[in-house]
Amino acid sequence: MKNLLLFLLACSLGAAAAARPIRGSVKCGGKPMGGVTVTDGYTFAQSDEQGIFTLDADDQALFISLVTPSGYLAPLDGGIPQFYRAYDPAAKRYDFELQPWPGSGECYELLAIADPQPKTEEHFRRLRSEVMPALQAATDNGRTRGSNQAAIVLGDIVWDSPELFAGVKAEFAGLGVPVYGVIGNHDHDLNKYTDREATENYRRHFGPTYYAFDMGRTHYIVLDDIVYHGAKKYEEQIDTMQLRWAAAYAERLPAGSRVCIAMHAPAMKSWLGNRVMESAERLMDAFAGHELHFITGHTHLNSNYDIREGVTEHNVA
C-alpha cells in the first residue's frame, strides 16, 4: 500500500510538472489590449484590461500564439503574420504587439489558394511567371477598391521539396497581403518518421500547424488533417490533440458564430460516396450551433458541398 501511495504521488507530481506558468502581454501601439485569447495549442487564456495574460504552458507545446482579433493584424515577416512565438521552456515571458487593420472589421477579401506544390526549379519558375501575376493582379485590384485582403494557402505549398519553402514564401510575400499557411501532405519532410519531426521545416517557415484568427465576423481555425507516418504514408484525419483544442475553443465562441475551418484534405470525400472523415464528424459535433464552413484543398478541383445542416465545404483547386 505504501508503495502504491508513493507511485500515485509520483504520478501526481509528474502531471503537475507537465505545465509551466508563463506570463506575457498584448499591446497595440504600445497600449494594452484586453480580451485577446492566447493559447499554447493545448489550453487557452485571455489578456486582462492591462493586456496581461498568464498561462500554464504544456511541456509539449511548440508555440505560444494569439487568436488575432478582427480589425487587427500581427506584424508581417516574409508575408507571414507573427501572431506566434516559439515556445521555450526556459522563457517565462511572451510579449505580443498587434497593429490596427482598418476596415477589416467588417469587410475584407480572402484569397484561397491550394496546392501550388512546385517540386523542381522549373515548377518554381512557372509558379513565378504564370500563377503569381494573376494573384498580384487580384491584390492590386483590391487595393484600388480600398479592400483589405489576406491570403490563405491550403497546403501542398511545395511538393516534397522543403528547400523551396523559402522561395515560395518570398513569392507570396510579394503580394503585400498577410499570408496564412496550412500544412499539406507534400509539406512533410520525407526523411522523417514522426509527424512532429516531419513538420519541423514547415513550422520554421510558416509557424504553427494549427491556430486561429478572426477576420470580419468570421472565426477562422486552421488545422492539420494529415497524420504522417513517414515514407509518404499518412492518414487524412485530425488528431485527438487538435480535436480537444478545437472543441475547447468552440466553447469560447458566442452561440451562432460563423466559423471557417481551413485544412488541406477535404472533410467529405465525394469520390468515396460522400464519405466524411470520422474526425471531421467529431469536429462538426463540437461546433454544433454555429454556422460552420470548411475550406480545403488536396483534390485540385473546385467544389462546394453541403455536408449536413449548417455545414458547407468549399474545396479549392
Q: Which sequence ranges carry the predicted segments?
A:
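Extended active-site neighborhood of metal-dependent phosphoesterases/phosphodiesterases
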Residues: S70-L76, F83-A86, E163-L253, V276-I295, ...
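Short acidic, glycine-rich surface-loop motifs adjacent to enzyme active sites
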Residues: A250-W271
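Beta-strand-rich domain onsets/edges
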Residues: C11-P21
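Active-site glycine-centered loops adjacent to acidic/histidine catalytic or metal-binding residues
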Residues: D115, G155-D156, G184-N185, H264, ...
